[in-house]
Amino acid sequence: MAHMVRASSGLSYPERFYAAASYVGLDGSQSSVKQLSSKFSNDTSLLLYTLHQQATLGPCSIPKPSAWNPVEQSKWKSWQGLGTMPSIEAMRLFVKILEEADPGWYPRTSNSVLDPAVHVQINSTKAEPSFESGASFGETKTITSEDGRLTETQDKDVVLEDPDTVSVYNQWTAPRTSGQPPKARYQHGAAVIQDKMYMYGGNHNGRYLGDLHVLDLKNWTWSRVETKVVTGSQETSSPAKLTHCAGHSLIPWDNQLLSIGGHTKDPSESMPVMVFDLHCCSWSILKTYGKPPISRGGQSVTLVGKSLVIFGGQDAKRSLLNDLHILDLDTMTWEEIDAVGSPPTPRSDHAAAVHAERYLLIFGGGSHATCFDDLHVLDLQTMEWSRHTQQGDAPTPRAGHAGVTIGENWYIVGGGDNKSGASKTVVLNMSTLAWSVVTSVQEHVPLASEGLSLVVSSYNGEDIVVAFGGYNGHYNNEVNVLKPSHKSSLKSKIMGASAVPDSFSAVNNATTRDIESEIKVEGKADRIITTLKSEKEEVEASLNKEKIQTLQLKEELAEIDTRNTELYKELQSVRNQLAAEQSRCFKLEVEVAELRQKLQTMETLQKELELLQRQRAVASEQAATMNAKRQSSGGVWGWLAGTPPPKT
């Protein structure tokens, strides 16, 4: 679901946004808001409304509505919460949310908003006779769109053939199939066991599927497998109890099918591993040990020897991942890998392959807004990520593509890049990292879809690549086959040229050109390897220096920690001494205060003493004066009394 928007049409922004807004009925009127609420849930309607406002009017600048109008206040808060989000980002999120809520919206839009480059027109005439696979004679195919209308598409790049006539090299052919084909879908899983392609799950109209179908690659006959679910010792024949999922990985292992991860309606905390027993036709949950990865979908799962290597994906909260996990199929134990180097940025819907049972290659994928065309290599022995220069005709950025390996060649088909489907089928020589184009189709055909499946099998003794399903504006359930001319066996063809069958004569010229190109590439391989070795030695030397510096820094840090501990102890000692001094100072201040109080009392007493002394002096003077007066007055009275004066 994360990248469904890439395959919805050939329209670019802002036309795609206006087409989506026209579909949901947002024209700015109040009736359009009511129409929106009638189509989607309240949360989805509110989010679409606010993103439309942000895309068309910019950041919210209107005053906050009254609390008496909770609906308008809720709209205002949601719009205000978008802040200064750019208009083009709001448009992209608007279309993305619409795709998740209504994946089939694009085919139901009016013809006036469709991209004219798609060449889809209403077929008002009677549909051409068709076979059980849904493909018709000639160059015109009749396809039923999501709204039940019939459309015609011109597909000159896919040749419709009988099963026994798939003999053209490097060109896609559509074999006529029999039996009841599966429902159209994308993001399903497919795997081959004993010349039979098993197809499980997927996404149709936003609904996860849980059915299992098998295509016999010998007679091209479809049949549905009635499955049962085993829970402990209890069995049930009801397939509905099996978890429906999309974006999972289907891996063949020991005559069994392993279904790993995938998006579900009620996701679990950890990534589940389901196993399907071909003999009992039963699903069961595989018991694993260790710490499993968190639940996710859109990841890559690669079988390397007896281990599964899981990278990236998108969790249940739609957060992108770039973590690495390995499941040992012997011990059923999970291990999370902390690889060195620069890993790929978080992504989902990428492709992965293993080369020489040692190197894991990751190509493309997408984030919420960007598709990638980068190629990353993980050395599974040293667990080190690296990036190398790609040679040849490098593919365009894409996500939702599929890939298979034949020998040292990695074939990549489909995917999208936010504008259109990837129409070129490309191949990477994993030894030289050189790209080349195998063939090309028109952008509107099912092979230029997102979420298709790709498997490799053999037919009449030769390798074939089988593609099924996908989504490019409508869901597909077509089967297409490619018989590649292998570059991995060029040397044997050169040495045994006389033994080449006559049936190869039609492609001798193309094979010769491939040989010349391969020789040139091999001539550059030694120089590239020498350069890479030199760069690796330089990186290792630089890494050793960094390790030495790291050790030195660790030692210095340890010394600093020790010194810091000592200083802290000294600080604590000083603090204790300071506390003691502060206590002593406080006591001294109390004593000084008491002495000052006593001194003030002594000064008062001194003043009182001086006052008493002055009063005493005055009293003495007064007494002396009085005595003198008495003496003088006593002489007169004595004379009068006849008393003689005292002798002197």
UniProtKB/Swiss-Prot annotation:
Region (Disordered): 625-648
GO molecular function: fatty-acyl-CoA binding
InterPro entries assigned: ACBP4-6_C, Acyl-CoA-binding_protein, Acyl-CoA-binding_sf, FERM/acyl-CoA-bd_prot_sf, Kelch-typ_b-propeller, Kelch_1
Record-listed Phosphoserine modification sites: S517
Coiled coil: 520-632
Outcome of swapping K75A: Reduction of oleoyl-CoA-binding activity
Tissue: Expressed in roots, stems, leaves, flowers and siliques.
Keywords, sorted A to Z: Coiled coil, Cytoplasm, Kelch repeat, Lipid-binding, Phosphoprotein, Repeat, Transport
GO cellular component: cytosol
Pfam (any one): ACBP
GO biological process: lipid transport; response to hypoxia; response to light stimulus
Disulfide bond annotation, renumbered to this chain: none
Kelch repeats (start-end): 196-244, 256-306, 307-357, 359-408, 409-457, 464-509
PANTHER family: ACYL-COA-BINDING DOMAIN-CONTAINING PROTEIN 5
Protein name: Acyl-CoA-binding domain-containing protein 5
Organism of this sequence: Arabidopsis thaliana (Mouse-ear cress)
